[in-house]
């Protein structure tokens, strides 16, 4: 039986969450599911620091009994930006403002913005070395159990794009551009200008040699494009090199990223393997939705990477043993792509299949195995829930036939 003090604490918590949910702008459909996803994302935000967890767990396996077990209890620049953007799209600004304050604090301690790490501890400090806890058996015998994440030391040049998208959308929502946000914007473009042409480990953090990843180059273009959008909206004078840089990166992607033999944008320049992240060539606005190269990329990814209600990141050998499930966020990207190219009924059909995967708690893991019909990976996963919110909102304007 709850004591009076416990009852008071519960009542305060209920009032807090009820008032917060009441402040959100929700789609007209699947409202309870969107609320559940929003609460999940909000709970991953660390209010005292502004950091945002990618997931609250470590080493839940991407394949039962396998080695693909990672620690997600940290704040990625990419994931954090995308998470608070999803909450911002629902009308909640505090998480976005807190995250940008968190990032500004890190930049104050960083020599130059292009030297930002892909991820940090939730308090903004650098991670310790990734370690293996050999004395732990792991979930269902899935070893190793890891603490820390070696991706901290990788080169991931796409991270500046999501940050700049957040700055664009938050400043638009606020109707003003605080000086520190303009400073952040300029820092993101500065970082891209210095390093966009380098190979990197990419969004999927491959533990092998860097490549010229298509998604990374697209996000470098996004950085400059959104920065120019911010400058135009608030009558700021951008450095003259920004427009030239945007065109140079776009030319690079369109010249080198599309593989004529495959008929699609692929994972990296000169390669034939597909990658669901290549959908951002169109989702970002770099290519028009009706461009045949984007349409054929959507078709190829649906054909080769989709299995039932889920979409795999890729099918190529990434250097790690074992298999993994499809990624929920990749599935939501394909739904977005269907909307872009006008395949509204297909978008709704796939969305409903994702919705059917929500358990009784309304939570989503990182991945789904369509053969074993099992959720895999760390849980709950910010990526999965932010993707769900995003497509639910987009579908609100596109009713099925």
Where do the PLM segments sit?
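Acidic, mature catalytic/reactive cores of soluble proteins
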Residues: 1-401
């Amino acid at each position: 039986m709850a004591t009076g003090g416990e009852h008071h604490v519960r009542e305060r918590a209920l009032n807090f969450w009820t008032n917060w949910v009441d402040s959100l702008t929700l789609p007209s459909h699947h409202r309870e599911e969107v609320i559940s996803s929003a609460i999940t994302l909000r709970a991953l935000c660390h209010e005292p620091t502004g950091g945002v967890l990618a997931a609250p767990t470590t080493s839940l396996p991407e394949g039962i009994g396998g080695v693909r077990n990672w620690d997600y209890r940290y704040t990625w620049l990419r994931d954090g930006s995308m998470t608070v953007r999803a909450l911002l799209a629902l009308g909640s600004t505090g998480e976005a403002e807190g995250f940008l304050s968190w990032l500004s604090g890190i930049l104050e301690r960083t020599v130059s913005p292009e030297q930002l790490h892909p991820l940090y501890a939730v308090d903004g400090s650098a991670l310790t070395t990734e370690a293996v806890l050999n004395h732990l058996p792991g979930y269902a015998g899935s070893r190793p159990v890891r603490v820390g994440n070696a991706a901290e030391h990788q080169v991931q040049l796409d991270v500046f794009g999501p940050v700049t998208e957040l700055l664009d959308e938050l400043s638009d929502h606020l109707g003003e551009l605080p000086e520190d946000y303009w400073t952040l914007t300029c820092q993101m473009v500065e970082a891209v200008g210095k390093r966009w042409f380098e190979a990197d480990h990419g969004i999927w953090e491959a533990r092998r040699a860097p490549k010229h990843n298509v998604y990374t180059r697209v996000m470098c273009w996004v950085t400059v494009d959104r920065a120019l959008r911010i400058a135009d909206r608030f009558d700021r004078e951008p450095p003259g090199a920004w427009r030239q840089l945007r065109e140079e990166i776009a030319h690079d992607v369109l010249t080198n990223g599309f593989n004529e033999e495959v008929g699609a944008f692929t994972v990296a320049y000169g390669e034939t393997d597909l990658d669901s992240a290549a959908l951002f060539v169109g989702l970002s606005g770099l290519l028009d939705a009706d461009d045949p190269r984007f349409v054929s990329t959507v078709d190829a990814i649906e054909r080769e990477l989709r299995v039932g209600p889920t979409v795999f990141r890729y099918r190529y050998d990434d250097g790690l043993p074992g298999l993994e499930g499809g990624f929920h966020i990749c599935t939501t990207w394909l739904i977005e792509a269907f909307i872009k190219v006008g395949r509204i009924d297909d978008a709704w059909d796939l969305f409903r299949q994702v919705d059917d995967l929500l358990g009784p708690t309304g939570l989503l893991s990182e991945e789904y195995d369509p053969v074993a019909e099992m959720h895999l990976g760390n849980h709950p996963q910010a990526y999965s829930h932010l993707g769900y919110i995003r497509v639910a909102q987009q579908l609100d304007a596109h009713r099925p036939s």
